């Protein structure tokens, strides 16, 4: 870390401070793992409870899950297309739900009451490592989708309208994960920072509307990440004529 | 790091995001205008318009995000820190 202006100005913000766990030669950010596991556990519990006793007339949790299923299916079907969307729906749905629950969990659960030796608990998606991992997963899966559906004809996509597009399409393969990961990371970190700065300046009332705005944008970011992942996969499996 | 490099990095980081936000801001404005006009003319197409609008917003936003990447590199991983 070269310089950290936030730490100088606001001692509480703690950008770039982490709870390090040493595993072999790797130092990992422990607080991200803790929050991710808690949130994954909550999500799994919800899904298991909701699908335990399924009824013809959905009620309560089952109703919510069926609504989510419909929502994700529509998202995947419009972006990927009728033919292969079924294969990719679980992936898109997992991405959407994990990011959504991470963003909202980071904002809604009062993590501040749990004290850590260093760093603080928060949204797992406010850490660049989480979002880069998710974005690289998306990259791998659209390559896999293209290659498994069209074989080597997938590379026609690179020269599709004209071969002049070739360098741009190759650069795009690198900028796709870059922009996916930084979009999510930047938005979530910015939300947390804005709320933290406002709480620091005016601890009453004023931060509340900003918190609601943060909830709105983080829901939109989860939707955008899932939509773009589906769009990239759809682009890779699309047939050119 | 000497103080002139620090000052230049901080100013450059501010400019990278600030200038990078102008173009996409204008673009998103005109895209939103088009979407609102489309919904006003054809309210039943709202769902489809919203999906396309969000997707195109995301592509425009990525331009600002490249500015953000540059700013974060300057602030937290400065190659000239020495």
Curated annotation (Swiss-Prot), chain B:
Cellular component per GO? plasma membrane-derived thylakoid membrane; proton-transporting ATP synthase complex; proton-transporting two-sector ATPase complex, proton-transporting domain
Superkingdom per UniProt: Bacteria
Q: What is this protein called?
A: ATP synthase subunit c
Can you tell me where the transmembrane regions are? Answer: 7-27, 57-77
Which species? Prochlorococcus marinus (strain MIT 9211)
Q: Where in the cell is it found?
A: Cellular thylakoid membrane
Q: Tell me where it mainly resides.
A: membrane
* Subunit relationships: F-type ATPases have 2 components, F(1) - the catalytic core - and F(0) - the membrane proton channel. F(1) has five subunits: alpha(3), beta(3), gamma(1), delta(1), epsilon(1). F(0) has four main subunits: a(1), b(1), b'(1) and c(10-14). The alpha and beta chains form an alternating ring which encloses part of the gamma chain. F(1) is attached to F(0) by a central stalk formed by the gamma and epsilon chains, while a peripheral stalk is formed by the delta, b and b' chains.
